[in-house]
Amino acid sequence: MKTISVFGVFVADLCFIANAIPEKGQTILGSQHIVGPGGKGSNQAIAAAKLNGRVNFITKIGNDKNGEMALNLYNALGMNTDSIIQDKNQSTGVAGIMVNEKTGDNAINIIPGAAGTLTNDDI
């Protein structure tokens, strides 16, 4: 079987669910908070692994709890993590996602963290 290599970003998704997305300067009460894996490249690699693909994911994460979440998930799916760099000086990226539970609309703020420092030399 051939290997599927995916180059991309892992971020920890911090989802905040409420009846609306707050407007500028507004504070609202939410109904739910969910933390889970995210990042477009990571999501593609996970999908390929769940379809029994042999996957190699290329990214950079921090040496922290969010990076640990990524590695635990990838290992559980049997993905090759040899191309994942853990940077002890950078944190793993995060995405703050506000979701309107009535409409499904969202607003997202992404901090790429370690993945934003990936260079050609790293690859």
Task: Give a label for each model feature.
Residues 56, 94, 113:
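Short, flexible active-site loop motifs that bind/organize anionic cofactors or intermediates
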Residues 66, 70, 119-122:
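General structural feature for long, well-ordered alpha-helical segments within catalytic domains
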Residues 85-87, 97-123:
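Conserved phosphate-binding/catalytic loop of the ribokinase/pfkB sugar-kinase fold
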Residues 73-89:
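A glycine-rich helix N-cap at a beta->alpha junction
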